[in-house]
């Protein structure tokens, strides 16, 4: 049954934060809605979830007659069988109910009899979603479920969520959001607002509203400039006329004084119009998302073919992990490797980069090939950002400029990287690669945890500079916009 989650005058700041993360936010959310929650990295989506869960105290109030559950759920005993994890999380659910949910998600129910920790990350995501939806009367707060899902997994989870109701979903995947939400909750610079419809509808309206505000701002700036000049001219004329009455007769002085007074009134009226225009301009652009263009300096290479893979099969011990594959990567191509989780996409990238030697077949790289990489994981990022950048032998100023363009807060430059969110760490890896001149850019799931606006910046950059790339990425919209070819493993 429908009810409301009411957020009233919510204000919150992290300790030591100068500006509040949220200020006087008020929202009414229907518990039957399927809400997509979008916004820049670091703007407070996860923090908002924690406030709803009661983990953080904030000024204002949150009232709801439903309990909240959070995904990803922290499993206390990952070594237990999955069926036992189910019984702990959802003690009232029956095994047949979980089997039904798993079938909708394309998961074989034999996972129930395996230790939870042995499941792939994609399987764990699906199992936890199924378990949490079996908790009746709960409203789910789902935080970036797609990061460990391949393309097929994302489609299955989107179809699954479309059958459900009562959740807020954080995701930056445009196609995924379009497939499963009926409202968008946008976390802007100064506000949170809610719109009915899917992601594409919201985005179209958002861009239209931004363009309107920018046009209005330009008009008002021209008006302010014109009125400022007019006020100065009128004021100067008034002073000049007032000064000219000295040495005149009484009648002339009265006439001239009256004329000066009229001109002064006109000057004040112009000044009031200017002040109104300035105030109107201040109300605009508060939530406009400005993104500076990113730059890249790919190196030219004399060879037409940069990478040649011939009958390569990645091995793990004595086991071959995927059938032999052959491919060539030519100069100017942007090839996306596709396939189910665990089929060996990342392992093939590592083999091409010389970081995985356990394979059969042949990999040939063009002579003198310079490769820049974005790895999938971020756990190696620790300590000082400046020390990390210097260790990569890249220009510190250039790398930090790239980070600022990706909406990376200056205050983070002086904080240890262990304190960064996963999205912020991913931006460090991307900025490092963008600061490198290379013949070939190899990026392994670069968009995991990266916000929509940064994704669009990266798309535009790739379309502008046309680098040679080999990628693993499951964001369907990005692939359609930049890939010249897809290779299925």
Question: What does each model-identified segment do?
Answer:
Residues 1-215, 301-489:
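ABC ATP-binding cassette signature C-motif
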Residues 77-80, 84-101, 179, 186-291:
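Extended, highly charged alpha-helical segments
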Residues 282-307:
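Coiled-coil termination/hinge junctions
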Residues 57, 135, 278-281, 296:
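Intrinsically disordered, low-complexity boundary segments flanking structured domains
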